[in-house]
Amino acid sequence: MLVPPEMIAVQSKLIYQMNKYCADRVQTRKAQIHKTIQEVCRVVQDVLKEVEVQEPRFISSLNDYNGRYDGLEVVSPTEFEIIIYLNQMGVLNFVDDGTLPGCAVLKLSDGRKRSMSLWVEFITASGYLSARKIRSRFQTLVAQACDKCSYRDSVKMIADTTEVKLRIRERIIVQITPAFKCAGLWPRSASHWPLPQIPWPHPNIVSEVKTEGFDMLSKECIALQGKNSAMEGDAWVLSFTEAENKLLQGGCRRRCLSILKTLRDRHLDLPGNPVTSYVMKTLLLYECEKHPREMEWDENCMGDRINGIFLQLISCLQCRRCPHYFLPNMDLFKGKSPGALENASKQVWRLTRIMLTNSRCLEEL
């Protein structure tokens, strides 16, 4: 099919605009974040070294692989989460019966094996390994380590939370989250994935993702708040970061994500934080399902994909619901106020309208 010359010209201009935006705004954001990460990891590694001296079961897994750190997630340019992988689930079974959206529990396979667990004192009378008990112990150790470490003048524990959160030089927030890696397992609550009628991702990628497995994090779960569930303190939050990152390889998907995060940081960092980087990442995964062919992720299509994601975002904000990609029963907007979602919807619509009507909009955004 012949494409009219004027369409080719418009497309070329858009590709030029996208490339320029990546070179200017996106790379500047990445460089600033990279610099902050180096500072954050120096401080956290020092704190965790002190923790390990006090309690050898909490071994730091924060290692530098040519400037990349395993288990480090950028929440925003001034907020980070660092996952510390714990050893030996051992005699514990993974239980995911769907009663706790976004969460699961670890239960002793046999009551007689209690003493064989590395984490024996954190196992409840009912045989569950309590995420909250482990986190509480870890929080105490980190608080003591902050007072002893080399950076004690610039790092402080954030009070009034059960999470392990540090404030570095008054401007950077880091959450340190204990976790177990669950390789070779796939949760029942995500068993519907991939959808049979959608030809993405390729079966080989699906197999790799499921073999890689997922993580179980010791952190507060928004989905359980206010339910007074007896299991709430024992439950572990399911995380699919590695799976998500693997799915976003190929084509311009990673590039799209970088542009989305940059636009989010510059224009959608709103009161109540309804539009997180993780929401953008989730909507990008749904866009991959809507456009399963690789040719639809060529750089010529990048503008269409980004506009499509912003239109999805408006729809989610207006419906006040954004389902987790792997766990659709879990709503990423849970706990956000209707006012914050309404305000965000208006802001996103303004931004989308500019992007749809002005081919040179990225010069100003």
Swiss-Prot record:
Cross-referenced InterPro entries: Mab-21-like_nuc_Trfase, Mab-21_HhH/H2TH-like, MAB21L/cGLR
Pfam families: Mab-21, Mab-21_C
Domain of life: Eukaryota
Record family assignment: Belongs to the mab-21 family.
Name of the protein this chain belongs to: Protein mab-21
